[in-house]
């Protein structure tokens, strides 16, 4: 059921990282219920913006796909490119933390998502970057195993897998209602700022 319910504890994590996160959340909520420990859970999307390593249209952190798009080359996306990722500016993540502190009376014992208003598919993301760099999109699609061979890096392929296997969307209505959360940046603004930061720092080269 979408959007994901942040208060549903039946999350069935897929890896040790996810299991550890869920165990931490359950422990903190139990400590709040039993002992009044002042716990609030904040769960960010993919934190991005200037200076951050941004999740790319492959769902990992490889520079290759961004450079290929910047050069106007063809890229391949896994499956049909319809998996969803969630960029959020670091400023807005900090805003959720700060608002949880200033709205302590309603935030204790609760879980909140730190997200932008919208999310984006891998395909939509890739198209946006082609437009950002002034090129026509050149995108093809490969089945998962074939795409992993194309990507060529086992660790990066695994990184992609865990980013896209539980594709979905989030609602920030609870954050707006209880914390008066008002995201300053859209996900596309956040992506653009991060990519421009890559260019400014010489991590991505652009032909003039």
Could you describe each region identified by the protein language model?
Residues 35, 49-64, 100-112, 135:
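Glycine/proline-rich active-site loop of Rossmann-fold NAD(P)-dependent oxidoreductases
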Residues 9-41:
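Active-site Tyr-X1-5-Lys
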Residues 90, 148-182:
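Conserved C-terminal active-site "lid" loop/helix of NAD(P)H-dependent oxidoreductases
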Residues 93, 97, 114, 125, ...:
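Non-catalytic, hydrophobic alpha-helical segments
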Residues 185-208:
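Amphipathic terminal alpha-helices
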Residues 86-93, 186:
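A conserved structural motif in NAD(P)-dependent oxidoreductases
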Residues 99-159, 201, 205-208:
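Mid/C-terminal beta-alpha module of Rossmann-like enzyme folds, strongest
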Residues 65-88:
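A conserved pocket-lining segment of Rossmann-fold NAD(P)-dependent short-chain dehydrogenase/reductase
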